[in-house]
């Protein structure tokens, strides 16, 4: 008799995705981040669900309801901080996951890569709307600044912004709809994750060498289940250290001041994981130009398969491309730092140079260096 996990319609799906899935024998810990992102999503959905039971999406009571969760709800404080810092862990894993894909040429699997970009946009939208919900100063002004960017769209811009606001400013209607969408989007993300995995399992995983590994596969369980469990343990430990020892390390103190439309904070800035994009937005003096640069800073990832000029897939054996890649990482860290600084000299010029370098590296330098490497290898 066939094992139930191989014959039962539902168990067969799980078996083919998590147990008997053939995986390359040489994938490193950089391949752990997919499962870590799944765990992050699960943590966020569960903590978010319990927070939603006590939260009220009304401008008069939203801030107070978050205080109530932290003070009066049993273990409400840990739920709130797990959710807030869980988002940070989510983005750390996301950036490392995307970075891995860039380094090892995983973007050659175009469908998987494009669904991944959609996922990145969806997670960013969810995180932005979630940041508005506590209704602190940074929530309110962050929402005002970012939604206002849409007014840069010619002709329909102003109408579009007022339609999203549900009025003439960020107010009760905006908060209510943001809560509704913040609740809805993680389930859309979950559906996209299934599509992402579906496309991945069509082709099989890439590996550090970038060479097809069809002739050398091992079952996912027990080899990679145990490896993923180690990664999960390290990530959960890091999250708990953050939550239990310095829960406000990555937050903004201004968000402990209730939202006040009559008082603008001295420095409006988003959460740390958006700072690189915020720096690119600010480095262009023109509003529409800034918005386009902001969108393109993420959308440029969709061009990666077209910009791949190397005869090799992975950067493992390409030292010059590795230099370009790490220069890109350093540039993104610089942009993240600049995004958190006030708009004054010398930060303005540093931000502008870092923004130019970002697009220059991806669109010009990396493809050129790949061509040079091909010639060096006489290909």
Swiss-Prot record:
GO terms for molecular function: metal ion binding; ubiquinol-cytochrome-c reductase activity. The chain crosses the membrane at residues 33-53, 77-98, 113-133, 178-198, 226-246, 288-308, 320-340, 347-367. Gene3D superfamilies: Cytochrome Bc1 Complex, Chain C (1.20.810.10). Heme b b566 binds at residues 97, 196. It is found in: Mitochondrion inner membrane. A ubiquinone binds at residue 201. The keyword Transport applies. One of its GO terms (cellular component) is respiratory chain complex III. The keyword Cell division does not apply. PROSITE patterns: CYTB_CTER, CYTB_NTER. Keywords: Electron transport, Heme, Iron, Membrane, Metal-binding, Mitochondrion, Mitochondrion inner membrane, Respiratory chain, Transmembrane, Transmembrane helix, Transport, Ubiquinone. Heme b b562 binds at residues 83, 182. Its main location: mitochondrion. Pfam families: Cytochrom_B_C, Cytochrome_B. InterPro entries: Cyt_b/b6_C, Cyt_b/b6_C_sf, Cyt_b/b6_N, Cytb/b6-like_sf, Cytochrome_b, Cytochrome_b_C_euk/bac, Cytochrome_b_N_euk/bac, Di-haem_cyt_TM. GO terms for biological process: mitochondrial electron transport, ubiquinol to cytochrome c. Heme 1 (or BL or b562) is low-potential and absorbs at about 562 nm, and heme 2 (or BH or b566) is high-potential and absorbs at about 566 nm. The cytochrome bc1 complex contains 11 subunits: 3 respiratory subunits (MT-CYB, CYC1 and UQCRFS1), 2 core proteins (UQCRC1 and UQCRC2) and 6 low-molecular weight proteins (UQCRH/QCR6, UQCRB/QCR7, UQCRQ/QCR8, UQCR10/QCR9, UQCR11/QCR10 and a cleavage product of UQCRFS1). This cytochrome bc1 complex then forms a dimer. Belongs to the cytochrome b family. This is Cytochrome b. It comes from Cynopterus sphinx. The lineage of its organism: Eukaryota, Metazoa, Chordata, Craniata, Vertebrata.
